[in-house]
Amino acid sequence: LQANEAVAEFMCKHEHPTVYRVHENPDPDKLRAFAQFARPFGYRIDPSKPEDTAQFQVVLRGAKNDPKQRVLPTLLLRSLARARYADECIGHYGLKAKFYLHFTSPIRRYPDLIAHRMLQKALTGEEFTAADENMCAEAAQQSTSREQAADNCERDIDKLFIAAYMKQFIGEEFDAEVSGVQS
């Protein structure tokens, strides 16, 4: 984490182009809805203070010990923004980091490789061009898009395996917890 933060801070403060890993503050409406849902369980979430993450830790700890509250961590996660890649340095809410990018795995993630290339360019004194800025913006958008597609594919595969497993239980009844309803 320290390497990721240090490189992000250097690149941001020197206004060099790169691909950042960003995580915006929670959407106030979603956080208010979560606070309302959690209230009957005894939790007092202040949606006007999303930076006070200790209030969320209380919910997570409490939900761990009460089967009736098992849905709360899932709903809390749904109220948060998804992390994404961007060519702007806007910080990472979940890590409480003002500067953040992915740097430590250039053989696994393309954004890390770009960060290495842009840092090398900065350290050797090469001039950055509009093409560098455009490439970072496009790579951020494409990396986020591909990450979301991979997540969707993973969810679909999980559903397929669950359905295949549950096929043997057709006709039986089970208790279930509903964590959301979609129309």
Predicted feature residues:
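Structured C-terminal cores of nucleic-acid metabolism proteins
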Residues: 6, 24, 29, 39-183
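Short, glycine/acidic-rich hinge or "gate" loops at secondary-structure transitions
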Residues: 12-24, 127
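Hydrophobic alpha-helix position signal
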Residues: 11, 36-38
